[in-house]
Amino acid sequence: MKMTNLYFRRGPATVICLCLFSLLLAAETLTYREVEGEITVIHTVAIMPAPPGYSIELASLRSGGGVVRQTFRTAVDLSTLAWTFSDPGRQMELDARLQGEAIILSGTLRGKKVEKRFAAAGVPWIQLFQMGLGPFALANDKKFQFRSIGTQGPGEMKIGKFTVTRQGEEEIMFGGKEIIALHLRISLSGLLSIFWHGDYWYRKGDGRFLRYRGKNRPGGSVAISELSEEKVD
């Protein structure tokens, strides 16, 4: 993906991105609570305007201790320009960034040096797709594809392709009341789609990520993550 690559090819997408930009001019902090069996994770997302797009910090605090920290630099359409990942418990320290015609991944993994290079051309790189798919949720396209670098399982240290399929509008219970949400299903692309998919719901008014339901790992319990707090700084 080149830095000039836009989320969509048609004119309305530019309007959607500009609308999202105006909504996110102020710094925001979002908190999500995720439950997977007996495991609870609190995800805190801090979003700050940082031309040409945004700077995002994500801290994931797992019950029993241990924090995974990530940072993201994005374009205005929320596609990824740079990403860092730190998980001391798994001895993972990663840095990936868009450099010309390549995405360069470097760092350490369980004491071993990591150096990888992925072609940037093709579908967009969206590492934090919970946030990065807001523009698609608000558009009218039926399907969309993107890439993301894996940090666990068979896709670890690889860049995989994902397909997003629009499921339509749904009434869901959120915050004690019924609201209209936009339902997206994300899966691995092609034949790999049989191995994983997750369901994501976004607020109709502004494309805010509200809820996730799916399995985070093969054989694991179904995980449910939901927005619990929004704060404008």
Question: For each predicted feature, which ranges?
Answer:
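Intrinsically disordered, low-complexity, compositionally biased regions/tails
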Residues: 15, 41, 111, 115, ...
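N-terminal secretory signal peptides that target proteins for export/translocation
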Residues: 1-9
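Bacterial N-terminal signal peptides
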Residues: 13-23
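N-terminal compositionally biased, intrinsically disordered segments and leader/signal-like regions
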Residues: 5, 15, 72-75
